[in-house]
UniProtKB/Swiss-Prot annotation:
Identification of the protein by name: Fanconi anemia core complex-associated protein 100
Single GO molecular function: DNA binding
Phosphoserine PTM positions: S667
Compartments where found: Nucleus
The keyword Metal-binding belongs to this UniProt entry's keyword annotation: no
Keywords attached to this entry: DNA damage, DNA repair, DNA-binding, Nucleus, Phosphoprotein
A Pfam family matched in the record: FANCAA
Quaternary structure note: Belongs to the multisubunit FA complex composed of FANCA, FANCB, FANCC, FANCE, FANCF, FANCG, FANCL/PHF9, FANCM, FAAP24 and FAAP100. Forms a subcomplex with FANCB and FANCL.
Biological processes annotated in GO: interstrand cross-link repair
Length: 881
């Protein structure tokens, strides 16, 4: 469409709910320069096209379902959901009154406008079941949702200048039955599709055309009127009410016959005539001129003049269109011609314009079809001035405007085009100036120059459509891929969460080993992710490995934080495995805080998968880019814990003495030393002893010892699998070092004691021996196994003792589930041991408090006594049974 002026002009924007406006409820009416608009909410707006301002907004007590304007009386009728019918006088002085700032709705337009609350007295017909209405000169027609049937009611309209409340009811008839929607008991549920009412008058009727809008009312030519509604309606010159129901029925009621039926009752079913059944919800009923000569004459009519239409149309929600027209049959007889067309759907709204054109909107486009083109030529036996037929098929022409939920067609403009007033799903009010004569295909000849220009336009349009289709296809592919990924993620989550205590379909195992990097030994952790399920881990999956040291776990107020490693999982199919190696220490201070907890978790990123599919980054389509942020998931993703492994001192011990002499590796390096200390040591005289704290402690102080005793019977029951024929002490040491790299050598040599090196270089001695506990059981001594840890480093002995106690706790918990019973014990002896331990613990607290207040000279004796008490606590006289 050529022209300097823009075809679409946006007038104003109105607030709308998330997801856009729903079709069926919004309404746009235009009278002269004023636009009356309802978005389906509680507000009805009045917009001045000449001034470009929102002049007023009326607030109703509930959603507004339908609007009609009685132009000569300046009355606006509004159907309020579950309330009834309201009538507002547009000339009322209340429209110009000043309102407070609280009554202004700044979101509903470019400038604040007064919001006028509708007075409850404006409700002229209260009825919670009222679903549709239409107006005639002296009659108000309503459609009520009954318990099981629709009910049409007629009321007298007051004369101009009187109270707008309708008079008494003058007629009533029941229409077809329906299945009521589910709702709250005692409160009728709103139908998903509202019925459509409109009035039809014959051309000879004196009823003025004072209703605006496509479904308000129209006049039909006598030929079509008589064929559709019969001789009674034609003789009575009676208006007829057309009703389109949500079940697809298109029926009619002759008003004068309905009024007179009260005085002469008869069969009520005879008052209702079913014209057609679309088999889908009826959303629009209208009429238009299709004959070429009549259509041209109709376009030159003044807005207030009646146009005698020769074609009746009705639209269904899913795209089915019905057109009815008076036509000649083969015998030369005038008969009604009914044609059904299948157009793209779903249809959101429709309107009839000039030139025999019908406009209808879908979520993706606004289309126009021409019912005046393709009319069958007149035969020799038909009258020369007779009507032509309907086209056998319709080809919708795209106007490249999408998501229009309400439409109003204005008369032909001064420039010769057609003007549409439209409301989009995003709440934008716009005008569309169309010159459809250059857009619609026709039989008129064109020059070579115009044909070439037309071909260029068509090729350009094909290119744009092809490009848009490619973007849409890519967006659909991305969303399908995201849905497939989400389905796989759901399957993986269900498989992991439902595995319980059995083998997990996706597992992650952790092992440790020492490696030498440059001049320093580093403890490395190897995490193996294995997929034993039938699902694949593709886009969006990440393996998260968190390393938490003991200092961070115990000191909640410390500044240290856990280290988390994230490894993207790419194409890990069924049966595949992925190996990740990462350092555990020593840290920057040269030490290794044990125990270290390694937690493995699978993380699925919802924002990476879903966010990329909802808003493609390379799309040039504005409708794809405008992805509301609230559609994206609130959570970042889904976490699925896989494993939790604790690395303790027993796993980190190294045993250089176990290697054969000819293959013995050099002694493990300790933590990185201070360069100054290294320099002083090199300057030391040959033959002198080192003077470091560790050397002095090892030379002059006896090693610290900690022990724990376990029942031999308990150990045999726990170690019976895999250790048969092995001495109990050797089996116990092998069990303690099961996760150490040297366990195979310990097993091969059948050792019961071993000396290793801690990560800081201090020696740690493990001794396992059998002992007899004689004082616990009155029946005799209890055979036990004593596990003793010796080291000159207090920190290392505490870590090793903690590791041994942790293994014992796990073993006792597992054996307790098997229901083993303990022997009879001397309770008094146990109480005495417990009392002695309580005394030692109180003494420890006293000595620690004293160290905080004493000077340096007297604190040495206190510290020495504190060490003695700790040694006694590490040698309990109790036994694990």
């Amino acid at each position: 469409m050529a022209g300097a002026a823009p075809r679409v002009r946006y007038l104003a924007g109105f607030c709308c709910p998330l997801g856009g406006l729903a079709a069926g409820k919004p309404r746009v009416l235009c009278h002269e320069a004023e636009v009356f608009l309802s978005t389906g909410s509680e507000l009805v707006y009045v917009y001045d096209q000449e001034g470009g301002l929102l002049t007023a907004a009326f607030r109703f007590p509930d959603q507004v379902w339908h609007l009609e304007l009685l132009a000569p009386r300046r009355l606006l009728y509004a159907l309020c959901a579950r309330r009834g019918l309201y009538c507002l006088s547009l000339d009322h002085p209340g429209r110009s009154r000043s309102t407070s700032q609280d009554d202004r709705d700044s979101e509903d337009g470019d400038q604040p406008s007064p919001v006028i609350p509708v007075d409850p007295d404006a409700c002229i017909l209260p009825d919670a079941a009222l679903c549709a209405f239409t107006l005639l000169d002296s009659v108000l027609v309503t459609l009520v949702q009954g318990p099981a049937r629709w009910k049409m009611q007629l009321f007298e309209q007051p004369c101009p200048g009187e109270d707008p409340r309708p008079g008494g009811q003058i007629g009533e008839v029941e229409l077809s039955s329906y299945t009521p929607p589910a709702g709250v008991p005692g409160k009728p549920a709103a139908p998903h599709f509202l019925p459509v009412l409109c009035s039809v008058s014959p051309s000879g009727s004196r009823v003025p055309h004072d209703l605006l809008g496509g479904s308000g009312g129209f006049t039909l030519e006598d030929a079509l009127f008589g064929l559709l509604f019969g001789a009674d309606a034609t003789l009575l010159q009676s208006p007829v009410v057309l009703c389109g129901l949500p079940d697809g029925q298109l029926c009619c009621v002759i008003l004068k016959a309905l009024v007179t039926s009260r005085s002469a009752p008869g069969d009520p079913n005879a008052l209702v005539k079913i014209l057609h059944h679309l088999e889908e919800p009826v959303i629009f009923i209208g009429a238009l001129k299709t004959e070429p000569q009549a259509a041209e004459a109709a376009e030159n009519f003044l807005p207030d003049e009646d146009v005698h239409c020769d074609c009746l149309v009705a639209f269904g929600h899913h795209g089915r269109m019905l057109a009815i027209k008076a036509s000649w049959d083969e015998s030369g007889k005038l008969v009604p011609e009914l044609r059904e067309y299948c157009l793209p759907g779903p249809v959101l709204c429709a309107a009839c314009g000039g030139g025999g054109r019908v406009y209808h909107s879908t979520p993706s486009d606004l289309c126009v079809v021409d019912l005046s083109r393709g009319s069958t030529p007149l035969g020799p036996e038909q009258p020369e001035e007779g009507p032509g037929g309907l086209p056998p098929m319709l080809c919708p022409a795209s106007l490249n405007i999408c998501s229009v939920v309400s439409l109003s067609a204005s008369p032909r403009t001064h420039e010769g085009g057609t003007k549409l007033l439209a409301l989009s799903a995003k709440g934008r009010l716009m005008t569309c100036s169309l010159d459809l004569d250059s857009e619609m295909p026709g039989p008129a000849r064109m020059t070579t120059e115009s044909a070439g220009q037309k071909i260029k336009e068509l090729l350009s349009g094909i290119g744009n459509i092809s490009e848009r289709v490619s973007f849409l296809k890519k967006a659909v592919d991305q969303r399908n891929k995201a849905l497939t990924s989400l389905n796989e993620a759901m399957n993986v989550s269900c498989a992991l969460l439902s595995s319980g205590t059995g083998p997990r379909p996706i597992s992650c195992t952790t092992s440790t080993t020492w490696s030498r990097l440059q001049t320093q030994d580093v403890l490395m952790a190897t995490c193996v992710l294995e997929n034993s399920s039938s699902f694949s881990l593709d886009q969006g999956w990440t393996l998260c490995i968190q390393v938490l040291t003991s200092s961070c776990a115990l000191d909640l107020d410390s500044a240290c934080s856990a280290i988390t490693y994230t490894i993207p999982v790419d194409q890990l199919g069924p049966g595949a495995r992925r190996e990740v190696t990462l350092p555990l220490g020593p840290g920057e201070n040269g030490g290794l805080d044990l125990p270290v907890t390694v937690s493995c978790t699978l993380f699925y990123s919802l924002r990476e998968v879903v966010g990329g599919a909802l808003a493609p980054s390379d799309s040039e389509d504005p409708f794809l880019d405008e992805c509301p942020s609230d559609v994206l998931p609130e959570q970042e993703g889904v976490c699925l814990p896989l494993s939790r492994h604790t690395v303790d001192m027993l796993q980190c011990l190294r045993f250089p003495g176990l290697a054969p002499p000819h293959t013995r590796a050099p002694s493990p390096l300790g933590p990185t030393r201070d360069p100054v200390a290294t320099f002083l040591e090199t300057c030391r005289e040959p033959g002198s002893q080192p003077a470091g704290p560790a050397s002095l402690r090892a030379e002059y102080l006896p090693p610290s010892v900690a022990s724990i005793k376990v029942s031999a019977e308990l150990l045999r029951a726990a170690l019976k699998d895999g250790h048969s024929g092995v001495p109990l002490c050797c089996a116990t040491l092998q069990w303690l070092l099961a996760e150490n790299a040297a366990v195979d050598v310990v097993r091969a040599r059948a050792l019961s004691s071993i000396q290793g090196v801690a990560p800081d270089g201090a020696n740690v001695h493990l001794i396992v021996r059998e002992v007899a506990m004689t004082d616990l059981c009155p029946a005799g001594p209890i055979q036990a196994v004593e596990i003793q840890v010796e080291s000159s480093s207090l920190a290392d002995i505490c870590r090793a003792h903690h590791a041994v106690v942790g293994r014992m706790q796990t073993m006792v918990t597992e054996q307790a589930t098997q229901g083993s019973s303990a022997p009879d014990l001397r309770v008094q002896y146990l109480r005495q041991i417990h009392a002695n331990h309580e005394t030692l613990l109180r003494e420890v607290q006293t000595l620690r408090d004293r160290l905080c207040t004493e000077d340096e000279a007297s604190s040495c004796a206190t510290a020495q006594r504190l060490l003695q008490v700790y040694r006694q606590l590490r040698h309990p006289s109790l036994i694990l049974l």
